[in-house]
Design a protein with these regions (language model features):
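Active-site-adjacent "lid/gating" segments in soluble enzymes
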Residues: 1-130
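Active-site proximal loops enriched in glycine and acidic residues that flank catalytic Cys/His/Asp
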Residues: 63, 135, 202-205
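Beta-rich nucleic-acid/ligand-interaction surfaces
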Residues: 67, 168-169, 208-213
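A general structural signal marking secondary-structure boundaries and capping sites
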Residues: 13, 47-51, 152, 184, ...
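Conserved PLP cofactor-binding pocket of PLP-dependent enzymes
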Residues: 194-215
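Aromatic-enriched alpha-helical interface/lid elements that frame and gate functional surfaces
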Residues: 114-196, 200
Length: 215
């Protein structure tokens, strides 16, 4: 947790408005396992260097730097924010205000596409009956998504038929996809959209993870 807060992960994670707009820890142990993986990469690189040059070296890896590497998308966003003053993929755009640092962004995907977590039909009884859907920027990808969702009218609507337009109308995009998802379970949404090539995944709880044959 300390590495997460010092490396920028907590400041960019969590809800972006209201009483819940506070720095948030990840449920994943970002510092522990990630530091080991980074250290392993460093050791392997040092071994390769020794084989080539005959010289060894000291390998060091901190939890802070390991977590910082995982925040590289957010540091990229900081460079964009410094340059133009706003971030189009964030929920604050176009109507909200941006400060001088990357804000929290809820469940947006964060790298230029419209991703969000949607309630599915059993959400009232199952707190994890949600699905994550990404609406990509490419015209062909968008067309496939519209056909799968039954939103063919979006293909000719200037509010939605370009990526830049969707950035400006993201709340309407999210609301309509929510209407689609709420009629199905997370697994039904995942099966339907994945067949069409739409990036999608169910929110699996810890019990489901333990019994998933793919794990």
């Amino acid at each position: 947790p300390v590495a997460q807060v010092t490396a920028g992960a907590a400041s960019t994670t969590g809800w972006y408005e209201g009483d819940y707009n506070i720095p948030t820890q990840s449920g994943a142990a970002l510092g522990d396992s990630n530091t080991g993986m980074h250290l392993t990469i460093g050791v392997l690189a040092a071994l390769a260097q020794r084989e080539k040059t005959g010289e060894g070296c000291y390998v060091y890896q901190s939890m802070h730097n390991a977590c910082l590497n995982l925040c590289r998308i957010k540091t990229r966003d900081q460079l964009t924010l410094d340059r133009i003053g706003y971030l189009t993929q964030f929920p604050q755009y176009p109507d909200g205000k941006f400060g001088d640092c990357v804000p929290r962004s809820g469940n947006t995907e964060g790298s230029g596409v419209l991703g969000w977590t949607y309630k599915c039909k059993n959400w009232a009884n199952d707190p994890n009956d949600y699905v994550y859907v990404i609406l990509q920027r490419g015209a062909k990808d968008f067309e496939l998504a519209c056909h799968a969702l039954g939103f063919d009218d979006w293909l000719t609507n200037p509010d939605f038929n370009t990526a830049d337009a969707r950035d400006k109308h993201k709340n309407e995009v999210w609301a309509r996809i929510q209407e689609f998802c709420i009629t199905k379970t997370k697994f039904e949404v995942t099966e339907l959209l994945s067949k069409a090539g739409v990036p999608v995944g169910p929110v699996l709880n810890t019990k489901e993870i333990m019994t998933d044959p793919h794990n």
